[in-house]
A protein has these predicted regions:
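A cross-family signal for key residues in well-ordered alpha-helices
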Residues: 54, 68, 152, 199, ...
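Amphipathic alpha-helical dimerization/coiled-coil segments
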Residues: 127-167, 171-174
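Basic helix-turn-helix/winged-helix DNA-binding cores
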Residues: 30-138
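A structural signal for alpha-helical segments
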Residues: 82, 110-113, 157, 164, ...
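Charged, low-complexity intrinsically disordered regulatory/assembly segments
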Residues: 162, 171-216
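Short, intrinsically disordered or compositionally biased N-terminal tails of bacterial proteins
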Residues: 1-44
Length: 216
């Protein structure tokens, strides 16, 4: 049963050969034209699964520590809250997909907590995901902000990602503007909203992308 607030996942029931299945499934999904050169094939995971995988890829950790980061007041939870039960279920799915593996049990008198580490395939998948721009304007608020927060935690310069993100969103915004001129009534109203949202997303990217001078 899917818990309240838990994103739908395509990795439920993945067996020990799950990694291969995930790669095949994602390869069949629509992709941005290869001329852009920065789309990375990888497993098809939910945002919760990507977030947990990226955190485990930073260093070996356990579900309780991750749940503190994704709680409403946590570093990532203020962007995208992931309830603690979902964290543990997500770790289980990542383990089944061979993206993480149990490493040890945390010593001490408290509750026994299993420490997980990312597998080589898991680390590569997380790195590729963090380096890939989102494909929809609606994902800027969630996926892109999570990626930027994770890159900041790692001390990684996000400039390249932000520049590639603009390349993805600019033609989308232009297409929306062109389409709006062909409609009337509520359709035009809806497209006006989408155009304003696209413009806001591009303005946001301009605001946070360091200039060439500031990077010298």
């Amino acid at each position: 049963m899917r818990l309240p607030g838990e994103p739908r996942s395509v990795t439920r029931g993945v067996g020990k050969t799950g990694w291969a299945r995930l790669v095949l499934r994602s390869a069949a999904a629509p992709q941005v034209p290869s001329t852009l050169g920065f789309m990375n094939a990888g497993p098809s995971l939910s945002l919760a699964e990507w977030t947990v995988l990226a955190l485990i890829s930073e260093h070996p950790t356990h579900g309780f520590a991750i749940s503190r980061l994704t709680a409403p007041g946590g570093d990532l939870g203020k962007i995208w809250h992931i309830p603690r039960p979902v964290i543990y279920r997500t770790i289980g799915r990542l383990e089944e997909a061979e993206l993480v593996a149990a490493q040890a049990v945390e010593p001490g008198r408290g509750p026994q907590r299993t420490i997980y580490a990312a597998t080589p395939a898991g680390r590569k998948a997380a790195a590729d995901w963090l380096d890939t721009p989102v494909q929809h304007i609606r994902d800027v608020r969630s996926q892109l902000l999570i990626k930027l927060a994770l890159l900041d935690r790692a001390g990684t310069d996000p400039t390249g990602l932000l520049q590639r993100q603009k390349i993805i969103l600019e033609p989308i915004a232009s297409a929306i503007s062109a389409e709006r001129s062909q409609h009337k009534g509520f359709d035009a109203t809806l497209l006006a909203w989408r155009r304003a949202t696209a413009a806001a997303a591009l303005s946001f990217l301009d605001d946070i992308t360091p200039s060439a001078a500031s990077r010298v």
